């Protein structure tokens, strides 16, 4: 099956492309994945891997909140946000395997890489905490990711542009959901305000990493900071919250998540994420 454009192809309804472990089709089936002239396929693959890992790892952390949210409505909302990010991860990892010519599958990327081979920002792998921690992480992550995806809508790679275009619609909701809860908690009771501020304080040391320049980029990360700050400040003002002043957590010799250097939490996360696939690598069900 072929399509007139990449966006039409990746948004076409085809359930067989979304069923794990049942012989599903490539999520980019029917999409022209030819790397445009003048674009380095290896660099494109590396960049898609970064963004795909961000989505995959943060999706996993959100899934851990299933049955733990304060209301049933929020159970559904958080689960849907996790599924949105998982869908983005699938498309981006599949694009990486096509762009560099390796034909490596999304499952191979997700389940058969070591911790040091993952390229997600460390913010995505932070665990646990209370609901205020979750909302703070989601707020920061979604404000940043939406600004990034909006710029990628004009990417020279039509497949990446289509993935970004689809993602913008999803992450706009994620950002709005997080902002509404940040205001509700921050401008609520004394306890809810304290919890939300605690969440922001905990996540803040990992914010600078989101805007650190990297040798492989299709959008200059530092250019996203002004928009991020402006939007976050608007939310904080309405929520009566303070911008944290804690410093950034440095990497190892300047190396951070994009370089495969992660927090100690990452190993435990991958042990859970990859356990079934590694124990039964050829299983189908």
Where would I find each of the regions flagged by the language model?
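Extended, helix-rich structural scaffolds rather than catalytic motifs
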Residues: 194-285
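Helix-loop segments that flank and shape redox-cofactor active sites
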Residues: 58-80, 145-160
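A contiguous pocket-lining binding segment that forms or flanks enzyme active sites
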Residues: 159-219
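Internal, conserved structured core segments that host functional sites
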Residues: 123-177
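Conserved alpha-helical segments that form or flank metal/cofactor-binding pockets of metalloenzymes
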Residues: 3-12, 82-112, 179-181
